Structures are given as structure tokens and as C-alpha cells.
Amino acid sequence: MADKEKKKKESILDLSKYIDKTIRVKFQGGREASGILKGFDPLLNLVLDGTMEYMRDPDDQYKLTEDTRQLGLVVCRGTSVVLICPQDGMEAIPNPFVQQQDT
């Protein structure tokens, strides 16, 4: 057999464009936090600075309240991360798949 080349494992997401920017992270179990992304690895372990956790309603665990708590520097385990999004939101673009009709 020929020598097998070792493939470098690549992350499914390229988070390098979010370094030093505020992101929001949702975790398994319903917790949410936002902070400045300082680092990450291919397993999506994240390092967030200035992290704030959004508190949940004690009566309804799926509902967030306006309350927050400061966590500071946090290491987030990649296996518990469900969603990562920029804190500033997203920019809407026109749908490139819709064909424009002449009126």
C-alpha cells in the first residue's frame, strides 16, 4: 500500500473572522452567553472574555429574562455548544435564487 497522507483536521466553521468580536453562544441545556471571542480550536472549544450569561425564567426554563450575570473569562467546551452567532446580528441580502419577473 502507498503511504497514507495524514489529513489535518479542519473545523467545520471558520471562526477566525470573529476573533476579538462579540459573539453569542447557546449551549445544550438552554444556557446562553455572549462575550468577545479570544480563541478557538477545531473541536469548537471557545475562549470568551467579558462574558455575560443571560438568565432564564425560573418558572419556564426555555424563556430568557432581562437579567444577566458577569462571568468574565470563560472556556466553553465545544461538545456543549449548540449555536454560535455574531452579537451584532446578520445582514439581510436579497434572495439570489428568486427570478425577478418583468411587470
Curated annotation (Swiss-Prot):
Role noted for this protein: Plays a role in pre-mRNA splicing as component of the U4/U6-U5 tri-snRNP complex that is involved in spliceosome assembly, and as component of the precatalytic spliceosome (spliceosome B complex). The heptameric LSM2-8 complex binds specifically to the 3'-terminal U-tract of U6 snRNA.
Subunit structure: Component of the precatalytic spliceosome (spliceosome B complex). Component of the U4/U6-U5 tri-snRNP complex, a building block of the precatalytic spliceosome (spliceosome B complex). The U4/U6-U5 tri-snRNP complex is composed of the U4, U6 and U5 snRNAs and at least PRPF3, PRPF4, PRPF6, PRPF8, PRPF31, SNRNP200, TXNL4A, SNRNP40, SNRPB, SNRPD1, SNRPD2, SNRPD3, SNRPE, SNRPF, SNRPG, DDX23, CD2BP2, PPIH, SNU13, EFTUD2, SART1 and USP39, plus LSM2, LSM3, LSM4, LSM5, LSM6, LSM7 and LSM8.
Family, per entry: Belongs to the snRNP Sm proteins family.
N-acetylalanine, modified sites: A2
Entry-linked SUPFAM superfamilies: Sm-like ribonucleoproteins
Protein name: U6 snRNA-associated Sm-like protein LSm7
Domain Sm: 10-90
Keywords assigned: Acetylation, mRNA processing, mRNA splicing, Nucleus, Ribonucleoprotein, RNA-binding, Spliceosome
Gene3D superfamilies in the record: 2.30.30.100
Gene Ontology terms describing biological process: mRNA catabolic process; mRNA splicing, via spliceosome; nuclear-transcribed mRNA catabolic process
Subcellular location: Nucleus
GO molecular function, one term: RNA binding
Organism: Mus musculus
Annotated InterPro entries: Lsm7, Lsm7/SmG-like, LSM_dom_sf, Sm, Sm_dom_euk/arc
Cellular component annotations (GO), alphabetically ordered: cytoplasm; Lsm2-8 complex; nucleus; U2-type precatalytic spliceosome; U4/U6 x U5 tri-snRNP complex
Location (main, coarse): nucleus
